[in-house]
Amino acid sequence: MSTNPKPQRKTKRNTNRRPQDVKFPGGGQIVGGVYLLPRRGPRLGVRATRKTSERSQPRGRRQPIPKDRRSTGKSWGKPGYPWPLYGNEGLGWAGWLLSPRGSRPSWGPNDPRHRSRNVGKVIDTLTCGFADLMGYIPVVGAPLGGVARALAHGVRVLEDGVNYATGNLPGCSFSIFLLALLSCITVPVSAVQVKNTSNSYMVTNDCSNDSITWQLQGAVLHVPGCVPCEKVGNMSRCWIPVSPNVAVRQPGALTQGLRTHIDMVVVSATLCSALYVGDLCGGVMLAAQMFIVSPQHHWFVQECNCSIYPGAITGHRMAWDMMMNWSPTATMILAYAMRVPEVIIDIISGAHWGVMFGLAYFSMQGAWAKVVVILLLAAGVDANTRTVAGSAAATTRGFTSMFSSGSKQNLQLINTNGSWHINRTALNCNDSLNTGFIASLFYVNRFNSSGCPHRLSVCRSIEAFRIGWGTLQYEDNVTNPEDMRPYCWHYPPKPCGIVPARSVCGPVYCFTPSPVVVGTTDARGVPTYTWGENETDVFLLNSTRPPRGSWFGCTWMNSTGFTKTCGAPPCRIRADFNASTDLLCPTDCFRKHSDATYIKCGSGPWLTPKCMVDYPYRLWHYPCTVNYSIFKIRMYVGGVEHRLTAACNFTRGDPCNLEDRDRSQLSPLLHSTTEWAILPCTYSDLPALSTGLLHLHQNIVDVQYMYGLSPALTKYVVRWEWVVLLFLLLADARVCA
């Protein structure tokens, strides 16, 4: 048995009454009645060594090593913490005015503002603040606040999805930079430039003022698919394209003023990165894009028609040119890399202090990727080119066999009270496509066309109408007299509906734009096979334009020999429409309104003011088109391919300058390896593969070139967004939410 005294239970009497340690928020404490300063040593990660005066004191409860916590995000939206953007005072007063009780909605631990960063702080502040204000409204505040909070959580889910999709890398900037950069490295299909001549519109390759993005003294950044045309005094001259969207006044002009801009961009981005204000600089850079206007150094006009008639190119020359450009990207990168040693010497000798400062700073930081970007950026300034091969000799194409004659029909036109129709005795309404009537259409050589000049005298050319402006509008209430003259391209048809089969002679053709024959049905749409003999047999022609509907319009002949039409609503090309002087466009009216395409405004067989869809009963419905020429075409409507033939009214005596050309939205067939087949005196809005421009034949009116030679240094596009993205990358600007 041990002789040691039995330990006594501690009570208030036998316990030494020593003052307890009192700790202060600043880190100091009172030990033995003496205030001790906060412990020395590192703040985080390592325990400080106890001083000699502290070693005799009892060690308190072991505190865990404090961890470094992000200072942003956790305090957002919690009670007692201020709202960002100085919104606390405003929201507090607004809540007090709206609800005397001043109750604040409870978000709980899932407050969207807890996970906000950078741009997300602004977004979540607005959405959550709106939800708080909704909750302050008396009586209905609870349901409205709940709905608003649900919307705020939904926005936060979208932001989290964006962060996850972009990789959620530290800073979140590099991944978004790569995504945006990939979207910029493209060779886009350029838009066709349109010139307003005050009376009509015409196609051109000259850049409009809206197409000029940025101007330097000797270079211009513009949208792809045009060439700047500068007017100096009374002379207009085309600039030299060095890429699809960069042009220079003379060779070498691009490098004269670009070095200063490179210095400014690099030094600004380096300072933003060094001062840790990359987010602020990036926001200022992005916001400035809305207000900065390009300086006006030049007067650009649309009078040159640059490269519109380049001359013919042989297939051998196109193959050689494409073979020389098999690897333009590798060649460009190799040329840049080979110039880096020379560029370093040029930077020092040329006193490019901005580039030198950026190279020095990012080298000390170990950001070698940014060093490479700056070197390649500087290397691209001094690049030049040398012509290797000369231009190919132009080849000519004869006029022989250019047009094929149309079909002829032995019919006679009758004028009854000013209305023209086919003689009733020539009609056999029961003929079908399998009888001898179709054969007679093509083998009868005589046609009495003496009434055609009188009949077509009421038809007007497109030049007779006023030019359009503004947004296209549809005319749903087309009211034409009984003889609405469908043989004139500019007479719009009435809306399609239900047509009794007994009033129709022959088949009903509808245009998708390919011609299709519509069969008879009953009122419910069930097909009937009685040749329209029953009174209940009808043609259901109701439809809207493709691709939403079935057809653009329909044509048939009634039992008295009159041609009838119906179609989708035509387009109003002017807000101040006047029926006597203005055009209700039922086709492609490019020369009066650049937005009036056949896809938007087409109402029947007329593809252009001079061309219509060819179909077996064309000469029965439109006998005065007997001398039209036939062309094979291909169109895409809503992703569906249509191969059909078109009949066009064009002879060699008709004018066909640029201002006389209509637009045909075709996917052209090929005449040869370098030539597209288009409708006569039109143009297709598909640019050439190599230049992005329109290249037409000056003498042959149905040829458009699909390939053109260009003095461009590179086929890739230099976009203004590249400059913004490089600045954001160098400045460490983060754009994640």
Curated annotation (Swiss-Prot):
The lineage of its organism: Viruses, Riboviria, Orthornavirae, Kitrinoviricota, Flasuviricetes. Residues 178-191 form a propeptide. A motif (Nuclear localization signal) lies at residues 5-13, 38-43, 58-64, 66-71. Residues 385-411 are annotated as: HVR1. The chain crosses the membrane at residues 169-189, 359-379, 730-737. It comes from the Viruses. Residues 112-152 are annotated as: Important for endoplasmic reticulum and mitochondrial localization. Residues 664-675 are annotated as: PKR/eIF2-alpha phosphorylation homology domain (PePHD). It comes from Hepatitis C virus (isolate HC-J5) (HCV). The keyword Disulfide bond applies. Belongs to the hepacivirus polyprotein family. Viral particle assembly takes place at the surface of ER-derived membranes in close proximity to lipid droplets. NS2 associates with E1/E2 glycoproteins, NS3 and NS5A, which interacts with the viral RNA and core protein to promote genome encapsidation. The nucleocapsid buds at the ER membrane where E1/E2 glycoproteins are anchored and afterward associate with nascent lipid droplet to acquire APOE and APOC. Secretion of viral particles is probably regulated by viroporin p7. The record marks F177, L178, A191, V192, A383, N384 as: Cleavage. The modification N-acetylserine is found at S2. Residues 2-168 are cytoplasmic. Glycans are attached at N196, N209, N234, N305, N417, N423, N430, N448, N542, N558, N627, N649. One of its GO terms (cellular component) is viral envelope. Keywords: Acetylation, Apoptosis, Capsid protein, Clathrin-mediated endocytosis of virus by host, Disulfide bond, Fusion of virus membrane with host endosomal membrane, Fusion of virus membrane with host membrane, Glycoprotein, Host cytoplasm, Host endoplasmic reticulum, Host lipid droplet, Host membrane, Host mitochondrion, Host nucleus, Host-virus interaction, Inhibition of host innate immune response by virus, Interferon antiviral system evasion, Membrane, Oncogene, Phosphoprotein, Ribonucleoprotein, RNA-binding, Transmembrane, Transmembrane helix, Ubl conjugation, Viral attachment to host cell, Viral envelope protein, Viral immunoevasion, Viral nucleoprotein, Viral penetration into host cytoplasm, Virion, Virus endocytosis by host, Virus entry into host cell. Residues 546-553 are annotated as: CD81-binding 2. This is Genome polyprotein. Disulfide bonds join C429-C554, C452-C459, C488-C496, C505-C510, C566-C571, C585-C589, C601-C624, C611-C648, C656-C681. GO terms for molecular function: RNA binding; structural molecule activity. Residues 164-167 are annotated as: Important for lipid droplets localization. Residues 2-23 are annotated as: Interaction with STAT1. Gene3D superfamilies: Hepatitis C Virus Capsid Protein, Chain A, Hepatitis C virus envelope glycoprotein E1, chain C. Residues 7-16 have a biased composition (Basic residues).
